[in-house]
Amino acid sequence: MPPSSPPASTQLQSRLFRLPRELRDVIYHHYLYNEDGLIYSFETNKLPVDLSLTYTCRAAALELRGLALRLNKVVFCTTYPHAIRTHAFLFHRALSELHALKFNLLNLQAPRLLTEAIQKEVSVKYPQFSRVLPTLGTPGERPNTLGEPPSTYRDFVHFTLNLLYDRKHHPKLGGKRSERKRRSLRKVNPEPWSTPNERGRLPRGAEGKFGYCAQGRLGHDLAATFDRELQQLVDITRTHDRVGTMKHSLSAAACAIRFLRSLRVGTREHVRQIELIEDRESISFPECHGRGLISFCREHPKLRVHRRVSLWKNAFPVTSVIRYQLNGRYSEDDRLSSSYVSKAVAKWMVEASILPSLGMPEGSFKLTFECDSAPAETTQVFNVLQRDAAWQTALDLSYARHILPQPTWHQRRLRKAYVYETFPELLEQVTNCDHPFIHCDFHPGTVCNPEEIIRERRGDSLEEWRAAWLDHTPREFQTPANMPPWHVLRAGFIVWDVWGGARFHG
């Protein structure tokens, strides 16, 4: 129902208001509609909407209220704000360090503090990780999502760590200062989709001056103080030339969340369509940033979010070694490796697939993998995913049929040929166009038959299976003809992980 306006007789000074409301609505549509949508500006935190007509009179303002947001999609792109480049770099590094440190602390304290009651409570909330709990405390144990969505694994670690230091379970826990400092770590859980400089996340002020201690690396001091904010981290990094040479971009989803949070509820309720163009590598676990949109979709049932992920410029780019040095050496040798591409794409799939279980309303969210105008070449890469999904299924069938020795729960999930628990099923749904909200704008490859793999490998040992899985054909891909070479396409946009390497496949 359009907003009511004063009778036309009171607006005789304007020819516009002598027209019927239906004709005025047509004029408003032509005046406000933009086929390309309203492109968000991070610098201004605004949209390019011409509101001149709303200032002519109250009647026009009333009839036009919120119409631009209802008529147009709002478009957000992966953004590199030069003004906060150091903030973005530090936030990304701090977040990566934080989650690594939390797991280390959990692994260190579990033998002393993990009770049966805590194990039971964790197993109820995170049953998929119930078999992880008895192994906590193993020397040398490293963080591994064990086939579950990475964000779920981080939630599990945070939840369990909180229980370890909960006075409900350990009422007499206290004591020395270092123990209190360790306990404070459990409270820190910043949202990955928070944008640097957002109030309450990272402080404003001179770049590089965040109050971090200049002594030692974070991972070397489990007793580091983590009070209220992420800026209390201890020496997350040395701020070196990499800040200036690499573009640590913000995801389109993070930009959208920033904008939506800045709107009043009365304004936000007019937004109907959001398009997220994820066309570059970005910071802070971008594949899980859809979680930050759940509350808005629940609050506004008419809101529809379409997340478009560029495969060649965003999802595909991973590497297994440090090939990108600051001086450019070795970069020309880099290619898209077949050994890591399945895990890279599957991570986006599994993170999106759990959104409904976290509260995303049905029909509110859609994820599209885009081929960047190279459908044939992208299909060839997806044939690797099809092959790896079939291998994961073939191995599971071989275990069940006693063709291969039955592995332990951990052994199965740590093997090279294992991607994610739900990966084969998700890829099959996407290939058959059966998934309700994950799609491709190209043909997603040819399905492989796991039974054929079992027949071909019958009689092989587990070691021979492992060697055969590593023998991908082709082993690597160069970019399609319509794009720059792989190392040029990635140059300047590589998101480096906490250990100094380029974004890793896991």
Please name every model-derived segment.
Residues 254, 307, 335, 343, ...:
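Phosphate/pyrophosphate-recognition segments in soluble nucleotide-handling domains
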Residues 76-79, 308-310, 370:
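Conserved beta-strand termini and adjacent loop/short-helix elements that scaffold enzyme active sites
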Residues 88-89, 295, 302, 332, ...:
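Short alpha-helix boundary/capping motifs
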Residues 269-277, 362-371:
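Short, hydrophobic/proline-enriched secondary-structure or compact coil segments at domain edges
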Residues 316-357:
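Acidic, metal/cofactor-coordinating or nucleic-acid-engaging core segments within structured domains
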Residues 306-321, 410:
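A two-mode feature
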Residues 1-273, 278-301, 322-329, 355-356, ...:
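Short, surface-exposed structural microsegments at secondary-structure boundaries
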